[in-house]
Curated annotation (Swiss-Prot):
Subcellular location: Nucleus
Keyword tRNA processing applies: no
Disulfide bonds: none
Residue ranges of DNA binding: 58-126
Keywords on record: Activator, Developmental protein, DNA-binding, Gastrulation, Nucleus, Transcription, Transcription regulation, Wnt signaling pathway
Protein name according to UniProt: Transcription factor Sox-17-beta.3
Length: 376
């Protein structure tokens, strides 16, 4: 019968020997314990070299505190074995400060003797402080996050210049588009000038400063479009223009409105509102006949203001010569009048409109031209 292992290891099992050392005898086998012993000897040799380097380094001479703390630290360590070295140093510092000069004198003399001896032993000694490796590592890490100095040359400046040029081109294109097309809500975000402001006394500059949002004056194209929209939007009210014969009827209706108790509420509602040259009339005021007459006259006055801004200088000089200088005194005093009294002056004898309104319109047009186009 054949053996179960095929006759390969029958002799080894009988004699109790392994065939691996015989087959691989050419390789060197080492004991694991010898490896650890070799590592231990190398470590001891390295520590001996480090000790030799430390001993080769010249130490500084001890001062008086070090001479005193040399023996005192050992005593405190024996009394308080659980304390850390930092706590021992704090205790030594406090106790050294509490000592008197007489008790410190022997330690000071010993430190002076050691210093003289150190100078004699090492005449070429120069104190070199230890380098702080941790601070150096932190500096290197911080320098890794900072950009290099080479990038701060003309390349970066060129990139910044290109970015600035692109931004300027884009911004100029946006400004040109905005100047060509006026937004729909351009005249909607401004506070109205109604009953509490007198148009001939308060300039647009100061009214814009008092308002919540300040906006620059419109361009010339916007001003022309404004005048066109103004004329086209108030055509129905111009058709209802009153004749001089309607003056007395309007005066009677005005007295009725002033005597009514609802005049305090309707005074501000019926008054037209001005938005940077546009006249805004409330819905409740469109049905009232007196309000329609006021709308027509106020629109006519605003149209005269716009057209007088473009008159030649010769015509302006001719019109300014006709201004009565004493008439401006009445504008300096504020009198709470109704809107009809501010807009109209009716001759009681003839019932027709007086022509004293022309100088005030001229002065108002000049002030509008000065504040809108001179940039004050």
């Amino acid at each position: 019968m054949s053996s179960p292992d095929g006759g390969y290891a029958s002799d080894d099992q009988i004699h109790g020997n392994c065939s691996v050392p015989i087959m691989m005898g050419q390789y060197e086998w080492t004991d694991p314990l010898t490896m650890f012993q070799d590592a231990k000897t190398k470590k001891e040799a390295g520590s001996a070299n480090s000790r030799g380097k430390a001993e080769a380094r010249i130490r500084r001479p001890m001062n008086a505190f070090m001479v005193w703390a040399k023996d005192e630290r050992k005593r405190l360590a024996q009394q308080n074995p659980d304390l850390h070295n930092a706590e021992l140093s704090k205790m030594l510092g406090k106790s050294w400060k509490s000592l008197t000069l007489a008790s410190k004198r022997p330690f000071v003399e010993e430190a002076e003797r050691l210093r003289v001896q150190h100078i004699q032993d090492y005449p070429d000694y120069k104190y070199r402080p230890r380098r702080k490796k941790q601070v150096k590592r932190m500096k290197r890490e911080e320098e890794g996050f900072l950009p290099s100095a080479n990038l701060a040359g003309p390349q970066v400046m060129g990139c910044n210049a290109m970015v600035g040029q692109n931004y300027k081109m884009q911004y100029s294109g946006q400004n040109s588009q905005q100047s060509q097309i006026t937004p729909a809500g351009y005249f909607e975000d401004h506070n109205p000038v109604g009953y509490y402001y007198r148009g001939y006394n308060v300039s647009k500059y100061y009214m814009s400063q008092n308002s919540s949002g300040y906006c620059s004056p419109p361009a010339q194209g916007e001003y022309q479009a404004l005048s066109y929209n103004f004329n086209s939007s108030y055509m129905p009210y111009q058709q209802n223009a009153s004749t001089p014969a309607m003056g007395k009827q309007m005066a009677v209706k005005e007295n009725i409105i002033q005597e009514s108790p609802e005049h305090g509420i309707m005074g501000c509602q019926v008054s037209p509102q001005m938005y940077n040259g546009q006249m805004y009339v409330p819905e409740c005021a469109k049905t009232h006949p007196v309000a329609q007459t006021e709308q027509h006259s106020s629109s006519h006055q605003s149209q005269q203001m716009v057209t007088q801004n473009y008159l030649p200088s010769q015509q302006d000089g001719h019109l300014e010569s006709d201004i009565d200088k004493t008439e401006f005194d009445q504008y300096l005093m504020y009198e709470p009048k109704s809107d009809t009294e501010l807009i109209y002056t009716i001759d009681q004898d003839s019932g027709a409109y007086s022509t004293n309104l022309l100088p005030s319109l001229i002065s108002e047009a000049n002030s509008v031209c000065y504040y809108d186009y001179c940039g004050v």
